[in-house]
């Protein structure tokens, strides 16, 4: 692909791209773009590797940091956190057992990869659960259909990657389940922050190998 005519480069969710192992690919792509381009980089966190990429590829950049909004009294998340240690070959059975006990009205199940999202969704559906997958490999039409089904209660479980879950408009989730351990504390906090919002109580479960 000839990138010599590129005028603007936008790097969105840069920290997630690095977590997924795309740092070298990102560098290689940026090296092929003109030095005169305009670059915008968006990242929820600013780890050293992101800062290094910014220094190399952004010319006289302006850094804009958005401060966290203060949490109002009574609005702090109230999330009960639980971890279950199981052998890898029993993870799907453990997930099913957690769901049977918790009986969530609406739950987000986080997986690390697209393939795992599809596999876990298929396994849950084969056991009689109403679950849908959402990840970056799906078209916008597919994603919209899945989100509509989740919001209206047609499906009770949404199995997602971290990247796909960012920016989703989901007003209330009763449970968050980490099928895989997140890559960092920030990702963990972002995941479980989907439940227990606006003073509600929520629950977060993590399945640990």
What residues fall within each predicted segment?
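Conserved helicase RecA-like core
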Residues: 1-209
């Amino acid at each position: 692909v000839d990138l010599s005519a590129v005028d603007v480069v936008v790097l969105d969710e840069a920290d997630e791209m690095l977590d997924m192992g795309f740092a070298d690919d990102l560098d290689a792509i940026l090296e092929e773009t003109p030095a005169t381009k305009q670059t915008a980089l968006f990242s929820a966190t600013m780890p050293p590797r992101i800062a290094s990429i910014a220094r190399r590829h952004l010319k006289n950049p302006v850094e804009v940091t958005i401060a966290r909004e203060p949490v109002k009294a009574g609005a702090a998340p109230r999330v009960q956190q639980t971890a279950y240690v199981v052998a890898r070959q029993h993870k799907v059975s453990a997930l099913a057992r957690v769901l049977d006990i918790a009986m969530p009205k609406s739950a987000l199940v986080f997986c690390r990869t697209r393939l795992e999202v599809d596999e876990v969704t298929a396994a849950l559906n084969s056991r009689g659960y109403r679950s849908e997958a959402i990840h970056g490999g799906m078209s916008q039409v597919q994603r919209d259909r899945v989100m509509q089904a989740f919001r209206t209660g047609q499906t009770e479980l949404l199995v997602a990657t971290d990247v796909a879950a960012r920016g989703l408009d989901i007003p209330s989730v009763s449970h968050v389940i980490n099928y895989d351990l997140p890559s960092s504390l920030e990702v963990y906090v972002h995941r479980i922050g989907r439940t227990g919002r606006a003073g509600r109580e929520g629950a977060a479960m993590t399945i640990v190998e």
